[in-house]
Amino acid sequence: MDRGIYRTVSTILTQVIVDPYDEAFYTPTKVLGRYMDVEEASAERKKGNYVVEEPGKGFRRIVAAPNPVSIVEIDAIKALLDADQVVIACGGGGIPVLEQDHRLKGASAVIEKDLTAGKMAEETDADSLIILTSVEKVKINMDRPEEEELREISVDQAKAYMEEGHFGKYNMYPKFRAAVEFLEKREGRSALITSFDKLDEALKG
């Protein structure tokens, strides 16, 4: 209300379908949960869970980060948007689920929130995708003499920078991937990656 917004806000607990044959399930990368001792880690392994050791700290679970296939509650999200409501959905990337015998079963995984955001923007046929992060502008050639801020680039340029490894696998890369996939689905779209503090300025160009 302080911002003069008087629309109804709805929050949806969101499930996101993932592919059980996604390669990510064979190479888990997402570390999560509390630290465990040797006995607890051994018990987790016996359950079939992956565990990784962090020297000097202990052991933690490590899970897959599969790609989002579709959003289960997308029709509800669309209905609320059509009713002119502000919708909060897909928090944390959504709850990963697998389709099994006409049922949904929870998956031991974490979905990249940026990819889920892109999937939701795609499935709601949004015109723009905005991803907020901690930096005002994305840079290439970080910490080098040729370091450069990116202001406006094409999809082809973004893909080239990704292939050259400018964004790191777990930091800026998922954001660029989400933006590229969103833009490639339909012409006339835009994607913006910036910080919350600079969002208004960025929207004005």
Where are these regions (language model features)?
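C-terminal catalytic "cap/lid" subdomain
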Residues: 1-205
